[in-house]
Amino acid sequence: AVLNALANGHERFSLFELGAGDGVKTKHLLRRALEQGRDPLYRPIDISGHVLDQLGRTLKKELPALRYQAEQGEYFEAIERGFTDPSEPKAVLFLGSNIGNLDREQAIALLKGVADHLGPNDRFLVGFDRKKDPATIRRAYNDSEGLTRDFNLNLLHRINRELGADLNVERFIHTPVYDPALGRALSYIVSTCDQVVHIPGAEKPVHFKAWEAMHTEISQKYDD
C-alpha cells in the first residue's frame, strides 16, 4: 500500500529520501518496486558523502538494476538542487522520525520547502514519533544499555579524533530530559568539573565550568 501510494500509478519515478543513512528501511520498498516491474530512480539525500558512497556500493551489489543518484548536502540545499528535474514524478520520504530532530520552526520550514517543489502528481511521506507515556519516553533516552548515552558522548570522541582535541570524555555525563507539555525530549552533555580543552588551530582554549551543559539532541514528539 505504501509503495502504491508513493508510485501513484507511475512505473518510472524519482524516490528522494531525506537523511537516508544506510537506507535499510527503503531497500525493502525499492526491492518490491523492482519486483513489480517499476523503474524507480533512488535519490538519497544525506550530509555524509561517506554514508552515500557506502549506500551506493551496497545497492549496486543487492539491487543491481536500480537507478541511483545520490545528493550530498543539507536538506534545504539538496532540495533546491535536486527537486528541479521535471522529467519524472517525485516521491519524497522522510522516515525514522527524523523530523523530530528539528525544532518547530525548522520542521515547518522543511515541510514548506518540500511542498513548494512538489506538483499534483508527487507524493511526500513523513514519519512522526507520537507523544506517549512520559515514563516510556524517558526510558528510551536513558536506556539501561546506555545506547543513547554512548551516541551523544561519541560527539566528544569525534572531536578528539577528527580535530585533535584533548577532551577527557570521562569528565562529561549524558543527561536526557523530557518536557511532556511540549512533547520535547532533549539531550545534554554536562561537564562534571571545571576544565580546559585545547583544540589545535583554535584561537583559544575552551573553558567549561562544573555542571555546564551543552545541548546535543532534540527529539520532538507530535500529537494530532
Q: What annotation goes with each model-predicted range?
A:
Residues 1-13:
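Conserved alpha-helix/loop element of class I SAM-dependent methyltransferases that forms part
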Residues 25-29:
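Residues at the N-terminus of the alpha-helix immediately C-terminal to the conserved SAM/SAH-binding loop
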Residues 79-87:
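Short amphipathic alpha-helix with an adjacent loop that forms part of the alpha/beta core around
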Residues 116-131:
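Conserved beta-strand signature within the Rossmann-like core of class I S-adenosyl-L-methionine
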Residues 130, 136-224:
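Substrate-binding/catalytic lobe of Class I Rossmann-like enzymes that use SAM or dcSAM, i.e.
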